[in-house]
């Protein structure tokens, strides 16, 4: 008479491997979604920081700076309002925006920059702001851009 040796059958091993594969796939998907939400939160925080620097500049100078460039500073003379204008986190999470960099434009009235528009792109709805290209102005951050 043969004695059964303790161990696992091939079917049991395949079932366990399939379950482990499924769990790892689900965790990777959840991790990627969390990373995308984190990048959107960072984009929104960057825009709010840029707005704060622009408003401090406006309070001191009576107009907004005529240009800002990611990687440069917002400064006037010896006063630095923002050391480095942030670049958006990569990768871009929304393909409908084209260039995902923050785009700054000013409205000139009597050669003074009296208003600005700061365009930014979100990959998903964040803090009530829809995915896609949005515009921040002195009035707020959640204005939808007209395309």
Please name every model-derived segment.
Residues 2-31:
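N-terminal single-pass transmembrane signal-anchor helix
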Residues 5, 42, 110-113:
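A generic fold-level signal
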Residues 17, 44, 51:
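Conserved catalytic core of two-component sensor histidine kinases
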Residues 25-28, 36, 52, 56-59:
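Regular, well-ordered alpha-helical segments
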Residues 28-48:
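Aliphatic-rich helix starts adjacent to a transmembrane/signal segment
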Residues 52-124, 146:
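Extracellular/periplasmic head regions of type IV pilus-like filament subunits
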Residues 124-130:
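Short, surface-exposed beta-strand/loop "edge" segments at domain boundaries and coil↔beta transitions
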Residues 130-147:
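Low-complexity, S/T/G/P-rich flexible repeat/linker segments used as non-globular hinges
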